[in-house]
Amino acid sequence: MYFYNVYGKRQICRGDMATVVGIFEDCILNKKSLPVVRPGSQTRRFTHVKDTVNACITAWIKNKNAHYSVASDKSYSIIQLARMFSSKIKYLPARLGERFLSALTLTNLNNKIIRLKANIKLKDYISDFLSKNQTI
């Protein structure tokens, strides 16, 4: 199974393996600007950990011997994601070799055997996070 930008409770928020959602959450909690690598139009598909686990369970139950791409069907740019947090943004220089589009294409999505819809929406997750942490 291939997982794409999994986010949720207990995600990695610092270091080389940190998720972008986790990095942004950590910045909010520490009252720092959100770091966005220029140009910010890079797109990613973000999938909540509970939706990822549901996909794994479904694959196990179906007992299919295949490769699965587990990702939301909606892409967001990094700048769109940052704006969902309603915080200051700090632009970082572009990185050599930065991927601009989600690695998951429509072809990958159409070839999935497991067809599940994301139950947890990224915007709802972020709104919930902000409402729980606005006094911090």
Range-by-range predicted roles:
Residues 1-19:
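Flexible, glycine-rich beta-alpha linker
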Residues 73:
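Conserved short acidic donor-positioning loop in nucleotide-sugar-dependent glycosyltransferases
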Residues 6, 22-35, 43-69:
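Alpha-helical substrate-binding/gating segment
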Residues 52, 56, 70, 81, ...:
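Non-catalytic, hydrophobic alpha-helical segments
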Residues 117-136:
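Amphipathic terminal alpha-helices
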